[in-house]
Regions:
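Glycine-rich Rossmann-fold phosphate-binding loop(s) that bind the pyrophosphate
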Residues: 43-49, 69
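Active-site substrate-recognition segment that forms the wall
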Residues: 82, 116, 124-132, 218-220, ...
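Glycine-rich active-site loop/strand segments that organize a redox cofactor
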Residues: 75, 79-110
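Helical element adjacent to the flavin cofactor pocket in flavoenzyme catalytic cores
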Residues: 179-240
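Short, well-ordered coil/turn residues at beta-beta hairpins
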Residues: 43, 87, 232, 239, ...
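Rossmann-like flavin
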Residues: 98-205
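Glycine-rich FAD pyrophosphate-binding loop
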Residues: 56-79
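Extreme N-terminal leader/targeting segments of oxidoreductases
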Residues: 1-39, 57-58, 62-63
């Protein structure tokens, strides 16, 4: 008999700013009665909900259940900066883009395939257009020395025959309303999205086809008699198959010991500003030309705007 258990459940100690920005009204459901299914998906983030959506098409007669230790949209899927980026930009310490063209092309196609799938889900589940914007992003250079990184990136894009546009200082001021940036490199393929709304709208739509439970962590799982018995705080689930979609939390069940490094990035969102206080275009996203720089995004919030700023990280071994 195979047996796995975890005494450590995901917790969130901070406030998710996205839940205060045009937040989708989502109702949580907790598993309180025993149930069974063909497929149990652990994790209600991007991977878990995408797997559920795909199973609904591939195995429409199978019963699918999704559980998440937190309320959908409150975990990492609902707390990132909301960039879906199609183009690789792998930078060596010397400032050179080092990946081979063939490898880059394969990476780009993989990214775009995933983004087409995400767009399909968004459209099928009625994610609001303002929560899924394909408006591209800018690699922003705040200093002349940082512009060198964009020069290297442009060489890579030319070799890949990818569309891009160089923004000078004046154009960056027109875009951002700030004199902070010296230049920028724009690429059109990036999607800027509202992370928590994206997963919550999808989860709400998918509930029409199968069961999704919030605040229902898996505590233990045992394989016996050709099925898995998964225990949660208030009930158990008998499942023929289990899909793990829980990112680094999988280590707490005993998998991948000493093989994963957990990387956390930290961001903050400002108070709401008026268009007079925060000029420039309504919405944009900037990633740093220098890989250790700051990611900034302007977000429309009702009749005002906010800035998201991300520039710190920690690594946990």
């Amino acid at each position: 008999m195979s047996s796995y258990s975890s005494n450590n459940n995901p917790i969130e100690t901070g406030q998710n700013a996205w839940l205060s920005i045009n937040s989708f009204p989502y109702k949580a459901t907790i598993l309180e009665q025993n149930t069974n299914c063909d497929w149990l998906i652990l994790g209600g983030g991007f991977a878990g909900l995408s797997a559920a959506y795909r199973l609904a098409h591939l195995r429409p007669k199978d019963k699918v259940v999704v559980i998440d230790a937190l309320k959908i949209g409150e975990g990492s899927a609902g707390q990132n900066s909301g960039f879906m980026i199609d183009l690789p930009h792998n930078i060596s310490a010397s400032g050179n883009y080092t990946d081979s063209l063939e490898k880059d092309k394969k990476t780009i196609e993989l990214h775009r395939h995933a983004m087409r799938f995400a767009k399909e889900i968004a459209e099928d589940c009625n994610v609001a257009k303002e929560d899924f914007l394909q408006i591209g992003k800018i690699n922003g250079a705040a200093t002349e020395s940082s512009s060198v990184w964009n020069d290297q990136y442009q060489k890579q894009l030319l070799d890949l025959n990818e569309d891009h546009q160089i923004f000078d200082r004046k154009e960056m001021i027109e875009l951002t309303g700030s004199e902070f940036y010296e230049s920028g490199l724009y690429t059109p393929g990036t999607v800027l999205f509202h992370p928590s709304n994206y997963v919550r709208v999808i989860a709400t739509k998918l509930r029409e086809s199968f069961e999704i439970f919030d605040n229902t962590p898996a505590i233990s799982m045992n394989f016996q008699n050709n099925s898995w018995l998964v225990q949660t705080p208030k009930a158990s689930i008998s499942a023929a198959n289990i899909i793990f979609a829980i990112n680094g939390h999988i280590q707490n069940f005993g998998f991948y010991k000493n093989r994963l490094i957990h990387l956390f990035t930290f961001a903050a969102v400002t108070q709401k500003f008026s268009s007079e206080q925060l000029s420039g275009r309504d919405q944009w996203g900037i990633t740093p030309a220098n890989p250790v720089g700051t990611t900034v995004r302007k977000i429309k919030d009702g009749d005002g705007f906010r800035l998201l700023v991300r520039n710190q990280f920690i690594i946990i071994h």
